[in-house]
Curated annotation (Swiss-Prot):
GO cellular component entries: cytosol
Complex and partners: Heterodimer composed of a glutamine amidotransferase subunit (A) and a GMP-binding subunit (B).
EC number(s) recorded for this UniProt protein: 6.3.5.2
Pathway listed: Purine metabolism; GMP biosynthesis; GMP from XMP (L-Gln route): step 1/1
Gene (UniProt): guaAA
NCBIfam families: guaA_Nterm, PRK00758.1
Protein name: GMP synthase [glutamine-hydrolyzing] subunit A
Boundaries of every Glutamine amidotransferase type-1 domain copy: 1-189
Superkingdom field: Archaea
UniProt keyword annotation of Protein transport present: no
Gene Ontology molecular-function annotations: ATP binding; GMP synthase activity
Pfam families to which the protein is assigned, alphabetical: GATase
Length: 189
């Protein structure tokens, strides 16, 4: 099972539905849920930190990003919280918009396996990661944001600024499937 921490974003139920379509059980929990409350259940194989409107109300996300031993994917605000937890800098976007954008993948990696080097995604850019922590590498960027996706260099810890769970994002299902594979789920190819 994948646990989705609800940071109040409009797409949190869409994340759960996208995982269901992949055959992956998922449960939405409040963002006040602690890492200990999550990992006490051995069926939990991964955590997704959802998007949301307010970085100050994402209570346990940074602790989860720092201390989880199971894979974590941050989406939009969740991506920003992961970066912030490790000392990255998050601030207002230069181009504040909610729109379809082109994403450029730097090179194939475990999160973007099977995804072309350029694709269209639906993204929200009010705030964004401006400076990436040293222990992370940038996986993807766009013309309006230099940090569209990150990965911790040693842990299964990922972030994406865009929304892979919405149908407007090309290959979003592939990205979510790749994350689920990191969590130990298997799929018929």
């Amino acid at each position: 099972m994948i646990v989705i921490l609800n940071n109040g974003g409009q797409y949190v139920h869409r994340i759960q539905r996208s995982l269901k379509y992949l055959g992956v059980p998922a449960k939405i929990v409040p963002n006040s849920t602690t890492l200990e409350e999550i990992t006490v259940n051995p069926e939990i194989k991964g955590i997704i930190l959802s998007g949301g409107p307010d970085i100050t109300k994402a209570t346990n996300c940074e602790n989860i990003a720092l201390n989880s031993e199971i894979p974590v994917l941050g989406i939009c605000l969740g991506h920003q919280l992961i970066s912030k937890a490790y000392g990255g800098h998050v601030s207002r976007a230069d181009s504040e918009e909610y729109a379809s954008i082109k994403i450029y993948v730097k090179e194939e990696n475990d999160l973007f396996k099977g995804v072309p080097s350029e694709f269209t995604a639906w993204a929200s850019h009010m705030d964004e990661v401006k400076v990436t922590p040293e222990c992370f590498e940038i996986l993807a960027y766009s013309d309006i944001c230099g940090v569209e996706s990150i990965k911790h260099k040693e842990k299964s810890l990922y972030g994406v600024q865009f929304h892979p769970e919405v149908s407007h994002t090309e290959y979003g299902d592939v990205l979510l499937k790749n994350f689920c594979k990191k969590c130990g789920f298997e799929f018929e190819e």
